[in-house]
């Protein structure tokens, strides 16, 4: 079967669908069948994490389809409306921070955390994370879990990773985000709102937070081998630290931008205009990216197996 299409010069040429399909198929790099079982478990950890929010949405929609569950759904929606735990420090579930899933995610890339200095637990800190990348996986593994033993490295520091307020509007997923994971000291995923930040930094000594400074806008610059940051209009975290007497800890994750490939979107292009318009109305930007698959190395939505190393340095205010 063939299709007649114009070429770049405007002339008509035939395109053989079979040849196109064969060309694409030959370009796919399939994973071997004899991959060691631990690596399969690592891949499964990433798949589960990637599908976490879609599964929560699907579970909510399924619950809506059963009439006998509607009272419970209504009660949960009311609870979502009146509950502001994401602005008050989260809720504690002690075992979740050390859940084996996070170790699988850590080893998949791998992701590591380098300690360069001690932090005084009697003070408060504002961690500024760079770069955002596509999803900030380095921030999640190193600072929202105990996969790399953050609490052991920085004893007495009660760190909370912050995310967009809109993420707490997804049913069921919000409960996972709100879990405080540390068995010894509380740690929860919280809102990045001003109220949330002030509440955390005024809870007492050691209470600290991490902000992914570049936010959604920075994800549009996340290309492998690049280190472009969005900082010029993102100085609110410095004012936050000064207002609350906290010290700044800039953190950079080398390799964060290498985890996915992104469709080129130079400023002024149609793709970038669409992304900026989408961000204006939805508060987050939709990067058009691809990675690897479960059984392929170069096509899919999973991140590539590329190393991420997070390094920080204390700055006193």
Identify what each model region corresponds to.
Residues 2-195:
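Membrane-anchoring hydrophobic helices of lipid-metabolizing enzymes
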Residues 104-312, 316:
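Soluble catalytic domains of membrane acyltransferases
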């Amino acid at each position: 079967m063939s299709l007649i299409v114009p070429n770049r010069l405007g002339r008509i040429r035939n395109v053989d669908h079979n040849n196109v399909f064969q060309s694409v198929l030959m370009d796919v790099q399939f994973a071997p069948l004899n991959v060691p079982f631990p690596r399969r478990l690592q891949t499964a950890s990433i798949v589960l994490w990637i599908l976490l929010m879609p599964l929560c949405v699907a579970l909510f929609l399924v619950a809506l389809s059963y009439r006998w569950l509607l009272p419970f759904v209504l009660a949960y929606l009311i609870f979502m409306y009146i509950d502001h735990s994401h602005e008050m420090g989260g809720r504690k579930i002690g075992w979740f921070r050390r859940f084996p899933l996070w170790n699988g995610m850590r080893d998949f890339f791998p992701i590591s955390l380098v300690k360069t200095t001690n932090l005084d637990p009697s003070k408060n800190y504002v961690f500024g994370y760079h770069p955002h990348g596509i999803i900030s996986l380095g921030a999640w593994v190193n600072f929202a879990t105990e996969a790399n033993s953050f609490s052991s490295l920085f004893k007495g520091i009660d760190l909370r990773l912050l995310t967009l307020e809109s993420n707490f509007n997804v049913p069921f997923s919000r409960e996972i985000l709100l879990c405080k994971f540390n068995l010894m000291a509380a740690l929860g995923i919280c809102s990045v709102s001003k109220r949330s930040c002030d509440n955390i930094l005024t809870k007492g000594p050691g209470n600290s937070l991490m902000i992914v400074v570049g936010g959604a806008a920075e994800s549009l610059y996340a290309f492998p081998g690049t280190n472009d940051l969005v900082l010029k209009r993102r100085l609110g975290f410095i004012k936050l630290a000064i207002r609350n007497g906290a010290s700044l800890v800039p953190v950079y994750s080398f390799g964060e931008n290498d985890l996915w490939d992104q469709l080129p979107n130079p400023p002024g292009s149609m793709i970038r205009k669409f992304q900026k318009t989408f961000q204006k109305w939805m508060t987050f930007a939709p990067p058009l990216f691809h990675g690897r698959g479960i059984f392929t190395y170069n096509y899919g939505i999973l991140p590539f197996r590329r190393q991420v190393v997070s390094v920080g340095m204390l700055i006193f205010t």
